[in-house]
Amino acid sequence: MKRKNGFPSSRVEDIESDDFSEDGVGDDRQFEDDDMVDEAPEDDVSSESDDEEQQTGRPYNELLQLLQANTESKGPARKKRKVEHNGGEKEDALPPAEDDLEEPESSDEEEDLVEEVDDQDESDDEEDANDPFDTHFSMVEESELSNAVKAASDKKWKSTKKETASGLKLVRSIPDTGEGDASLLPPLKNFSSVKLKKKLDGPAADLIPAMSDDAQQLAPYIFGYQDVLHGARNTSNSATLRDLLAIHATNHVLKTRDRVLKNNARVAKEQDADLDLRDQGFTRPKVLYLLPTRQACVRVVDSITRCFQPEQQENKKRLLDTFSRPDDKSWETKPEDFRELFGGNDDDMFRLGLKFTRKTIKYFAQFYNSDMILASPLGLRTIMDQADAKKRDHDFLSSIEVVIVDHADALLMQNWDHIDYILNHLNLQPRQAHGCDFSRVRTWYLDNQARSVRQMIMTTAFITPEMNSVFSTHMQNYAGKIKATPVYAGAISEVPLPVSVKQTFSRFDSLTPTKDPDARFKHFTTTVLSSLVRNITSSRDKSSVGGTLIFIPSYLDFVRVRNHFATSAQTTNVSFGAISEYTDVREMSRARTHFMNGRHSVLLYTERLHHFRRYRIRGVKRIVMYGMPENPLFWGEIVSFLGLDEAGVVEAAEGGVRALFSKWDALKLERIVGTKRVGNMLREKGGDTFTFV
């Protein structure tokens, strides 16, 4: 499917006010607007009701504190921008960064909320010693938290391991303070024991009428505000996980909001009382979702709305117009996981603020006026790391209490550096006060301990060293954390070919991860490539020695091998093609055709290209894995290339697969050969070659 250049955007057709800007959520242009603090930026992310809302310019906490004081101050008048339609064609664009970061303004609706708290919610606005929301955020003792923070910073954790009947390996860890129990929690079979807002009880049960075994294992930690790394996400359980996390995120936002409003009303009623109400952070946003595509964002929003069931959704049409697209029908033959990830709008540049009121969800709210932020890593980093240092801002992340990173394996194929950047800027002390009422801020925020109270949940189809680094570095929850990984049967046992294929694994020595690329290249050129070149150059029938596909996971390794083929005397007489995620489409087609026809004896092929395109390469007679794929599904897909030409499938099966690995590939190797085999292959001293048929 052809993708638009840049980050598409324009106005939707139902705009009725000049108060809208022409910029939407999702733009990659240079951000040129005025400084977000010094001047009132042009308002993009607003709906028609914003004329009532944008009056005071005071941040959320101060707003709620002063509502009953009947403040009449007016903020600066908003600039007006003409709405332009470009031939009626709609694009999806991001607003200038300042529009997303505009400071919050007052709302008549919020004032009504001080008076109008649902009767059914009265009872669950009080602190409850059995509610994890209260025990985790409000009732924790300072000494307990400080001891846990110190133990975590000293890397002192105690753990418990267990394998479930469904084949899930669980490892739970808590900071080792000399107290506490790291035992695994009992599975959660339904929502009857979950402390949800009463208005969510019915929708939650409807969303997830029956939990799967894996969901039952994870739910106690999710609703108990512990960190979770779930490494068994797949197309079968992704929808249930998404609904489960949406229920948790919505519940957290509603409890936070209603507690603040109730305490605010109490302050108004007891003005002479010396109340110590610690119920807020520095800024309003409390939940951060990091997602791979706009369509993934729409699916999360759909789960949230089915859970919250708002009477009104502001800017919903704009959301659907700019974030959602129908699936590409030409992809019906693509693998299921590919269709799930890239189906619909696969733009990976977006950000969206969600604001909740009692009966309404507003989309495209400014970040400082939002309860939830949903964004791609690229979209969020763009707003945080602007070229103009004065316009950089991450204070809106200072009070995030729940982080949900969904489909992390897809984010890995984008740019993991953006994830690291965002996580490193979470829960930092804000550089500006933003009108914060510090008398209402929780003490652990003031003590700079928020990162140890924050909950982080990451779901992924498989776990990589990058994700393990997040688990050890950023998952520092004082309540503990859990990692869940499947027991792997091994991708080698699931190759979709009608005949047996010889699959050989060659181990090479590598002293450190940093030296691994050099050791791999040396082993490849001296052992694998020398044998391959010898067969190609010594054979009289050139057509019989062609068809070698070299699969290379890393783009840096791809460049190194490609340059070696192009310049080395070793490969002077070897014709080859090379295609990667950066290769022009026309050049890709030419290289694949030459390879299929035998004009190229060798084709270099990267993992990221396969991730984004899922090509079926014809003409493959043997496969060399320079390194094993991160995604175990790719193993079967690539090995199946050997069977695409029915006439030569037996010959191709004899050519087989040869894969290189070192001890630093343990996680990949486990997914390919299986959990039971990986240990012996890494430790075996009697040889370094392992063959499976």
Swiss-Prot record:
Predominant subcellular localization, coarse grouping? nucleus
The region called Disordered is annotated at: 1-133
Biased region (Basic and acidic residues) positions are 84-93
GO BP terms: namely: maturation of SSU-rRNA from tricistronic rRNA transcript (SSU-rRNA, 5.8S rRNA, LSU-rRNA)
Q: Would you say which domain of life the source belongs to?
A: Eukaryota
One term under GO cellular component: small-subunit processome
- Localization of this protein: Nucleus, Nucleolus
**Acidic residues biased stretches:** 15-54, 97-131
Could you tell me the keywords of this UniProt record? Nucleus, Ribonucleoprotein, Ribosome biogenesis, rRNA processing
The UniProt entry, under SUPFAM superfamilies, shows: P-loop containing nucleoside triphosphate hydrolases
Q: Give the residue spans that cross the bilayer.
A: none
Q: Can you name one GO molecular function term for this protein? A: rRNA binding
Q: Which InterPro entries match?
A: P-loop_NTPase, UTP25, UTP25_C, UTP25_NTPase-like
Q: What is this protein's function? A: DEAD-box RNA helicase-like protein required for pre-18S rRNA processing, specifically at sites A0, A1, and A2.
Q: Which family does it belong to?
A: Belongs to the UTP25 family.
Subunit (UniProt): Component of the ribosomal small subunit (SSU) processome composed of at least 40 protein subunits and snoRNA U3.
What is this protein called in UniProt? U3 small nucleolar RNA-associated protein 25
Instruction: Name its species.
Output: Aspergillus clavatus (strain ATCC 1007 / CBS 513.65 / DSM 816 / NCTC 3887 / NRRL 1 / QM 1276 / 107)
User: Gene encoding this polypeptide?
Assistant: utp25
